[in-house]
Amino acid sequence: MKKIEIKSVNISEKKGTIKVPVDVIELCETGVKGDAHAGAWHRMVSLLAVESIEKFEHKSKRKIAYGEFAENITTQGVLLYTHPLDRFEGKGIELEVTQIGKECHGDGCAIFREVGNCVMPKEGIFARVIKGGKLKAGDTLEYKPRVHKIHVITLSDRAFAGEYEDLRGPAIE
């Protein structure tokens, strides 16, 4: 499994502002305890990969601090936006990706006001908390891809009518 290193954990008390790195965050059933975006919705926790931040820094020719894109968790090791519906687990914590990207708030976003662009609409991800716990910089999460079980059903009117026995494939168990 792929390991994801936590580079920073960040909180803001008000929406539309840059998040501030803190020593530890507590993930609970509504998201990050004490964060403005916590609540009973599908975007409880925001994550952004250092790889995405570095790409933005190169394009904007500006250094970006952790939390500046208002992400709760800054990670390294996996391009997060390529993993819809997957899970990240570690230290008893379990997060499930619920959304990739978001609508840009334009002037309602601190980084957009300053730079004129933002990475979150395309590469930021959002997750819900399945199992909570404490998380800090230096911790690791394990990437767990969602396994999709697929069954193919072949229907035959002639076999159903008893004209012949359909032997095309095994029965689904």
Q: Residue ranges of each PLM-predicted region?
A:
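Metal-cofactor-dependent catalytic cores
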Residues: 1-148, 160
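Glycine-rich phosphate/diphosphate-binding loop of Rossmann-like nucleotide-binding domains
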Residues: 148-173
